[in-house]
Every structure is written in C-alpha cells, then in structure tokens.
Amino acid sequence: MNILKGKTMVVTGANTGIGRVTAEKLAAQGAHVVLACRDLGRTQPVLDAIARAGGQASFVALDLADLDAVRVAAEKVARHGPIHALINNAGLANVPGVTKQGFEMTFGVNHLGPYLFTALLWPNILAGAPSRVINVASRAHTRIKTFPWEQFQGVHTSPGGFQQYCYSKLANVLFTRGLARRVKPDVVATACLHPGGVATEVFRNQTWLVRTITGWFTMTPEQGATSTLATATMPREQLQHGAYYNEHAKVTPMNPLALDDALVEELWKKSAAWTGVPEDWAGRP
C-alpha cells in the first residue's frame, strides 16, 4: 500500500507508544515520516524498524519544554519541504516543575510547544495543501470547569499532577478550534482526538500502583493509534473540521468550555504572545 507515497508527515513523540505505531503505519503506506523526538538513541529503533520494512523516515531532535529548541527543530523540519500532515502527538503528565521559559511544565510541553511548532511550520503546511494538523488531546479535557491562567505562566513551581494534565488537554482542543476558525478545511483540515486509555510513557512518572492499574485497564498502543491514523488519512470530505474524535474515530461532544469562542481566542492570543509569534500567523478568525 503506497497511498501516501510522495507525502511528508511529521509525528512528534514518535519514539514510543501511539507515536511509534502512527509513524510506522504511515511509513508503511508510503509516506516519508519525520520523527520529531527528544532523543535519537531512543528513536533509532523506530527508524531501523521503518527502514527494515522498506519505509522512509528521518529524525529531528525536538524538546517541547524549551521554546528555543522548538525553533531550532522547526527550522530543521522545514528543510524537508511541504508538509502534508503534522501530528502533534508528544505529551507528558505528572511531571512537576517549569519549562526553560518559566511556564508550567505540563502546559508548556503539551500546548505551548506544539502551538509554536505548528506556527513555525505553517508555511510548509500551507505548501503541502491540502494538508492536516492533528492534535492528540484526551478525554481528560472534559473534567475542566474553569481555566486558571495564573497557573500557566510566571510560576516558580508546579505539582504537575493530573489536574495540570487536564488543563493542557483542554488547551489542545481549544487550539484545534482556534485553528479551524482561521483556515478552510480544503486548505488545512484540523481535528483533535482522544486516543483511549493507552498504556504509554505519557504516564511514566506515575506511581507503580497507578502504572499497574493503568496497565490492566488500557488499550494497546496499536489500538490507541486508531483515531490518530484515521483522522490523518481519512478522505477529506469525511474529516469534520475542528472536531473532537473519540478512540473509535467517531466525532463526539467536547467540553462545553471548548465551544466558547471567547476562550478559544483568549488562549490563541496569549499563546502567540507567550511564544513570540504574530497572532495572525494562521490568518484571522
């Protein structure tokens, strides 16, 4: 199957779990996959597996906890030319602390880093049109009732718990809606998704008990990649622009907060200011 031959697709966090499965499956369909990950050593087995299967893949170092590193990574990815799909898959949970630029760690890695990465690669994504931006969110975003801005920027520390993860996942959904308000789906289609309860390294910093329980009741990465792969490759007319998909690749209701256009725009403007990009990098809503 070479239905993606000639396409370049970028997958962040592709060295393990859902990201690895996503990268391998896309490469198997003929795409050249750029694996944007923190560490080459941990990504090399994926590169080797793709090569053995006859696929094409490249590595670019990406540290989403450092916006300067994100800029360097985006510059390197941009050298690959037009991008036909960007899959913002990388994420973390339960990691205390702050990013290099002083943002709450989970919010910085799960939202601000991907926001900047997408903005910097936007010319390449437009050059690949019709193209896609797929954001891996989580059902956890539905737990949030308010969005406490003071917890995200200018903090000195953070507990990095599950609540912070939920905030960051709501930000993923809000970002998806903001992007959908700015670009037509026949140019760049976008969607976000819940991959299911997947035993991945996102939760590698949980206690042994939580990891054990999670292992009992979760899907495999192969099952968890279903929605990511579907939204990245389904026919354009079938993808609902700006929608939130469940683990079975079905459109499902999102948190009502994510339907608040004022909140969508507030996050967009703050994210642009915090990452140093123009508010109109993707156009105006």
Regions found by a protein language model. Give the residues of each.
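A glycine-rich helix->loop->beta "capping" turn
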Residues: 52-56, 76-88, 94-99
